[in-house]
């Protein structure tokens, strides 16, 4: 799967080839290519097992989120770096006790004279150890009893700022692409707010639509299926040919939809 292989150098190389930010506006360094053109490039990258993890989140969802809700200053600062493969993002949604119930996040951003003070932690932050930024969902005011989704906001957080600690989480394979990210009274500028204060819930729902959908969800299984067949070739020849055929048929059906 895409998450297992990251190469910043590879990401920069395909950025110079125009294969990142393909559908982004040209005024921000994008290429204004069609969704079909982006699909073709994405399919070839995933089918070949290319090391796409470094730029994946920035190109697939963070860039689009900034284009939709960001200020002109934020767009001009970050989008060209995404399209050139020089700026990587991590996701700052889930917390140790807030996964599916995302409205229960405890990470808090408090207003200061010059901006915000961020405190809390995020977990399962894929690629945070190599990312430059994280879009963080934080509570900026208490939720009401009637609406728990009120009082949430999103922030563009530079992960090189002081008082940010990123700890790798080792999975069953011994790899550490997941992370826990700690924010210990991190000082943010007022320009770090992404979108509108208090409207973070509606914004993050839109971002989740980008994360949880799209052809990448099934395209990334191509290399996994190939490795599965290679690993269990002998036993599959004896009794598993129908299973392999079923999996291939399902992938091809999804591809044709």
Pin down the residues of each PLM region.
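Internal helix-loop-helix
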Residues: 15-86, 126-133
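Short Ser/Thr-interspersed hydrophobic loop/turn segments at strand-loop and sheet-helix junctions
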Residues: 18, 41-46, 137-138, 156-161, ...
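Short Gly/Pro-enriched turn/cap motifs at secondary-structure boundaries
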Residues: 55, 97-100, 124-127, 145-146, ...
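Residue-level signal for inorganic ion chemistry
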Residues: 71, 155, 183
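A short, Trp-centered hydrophobic/proline-enriched beta-strand micro-motif
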Residues: 85-93, 137
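A structural signal for short hydrophobic beta-strand segments in well-ordered beta-sheet cores
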Residues: 107-110
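A short core secondary-structure module
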Residues: 119-165
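Glycine-rich beta->alpha junctions and the first turn(s) of the following alpha-helix
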Residues: 164-255
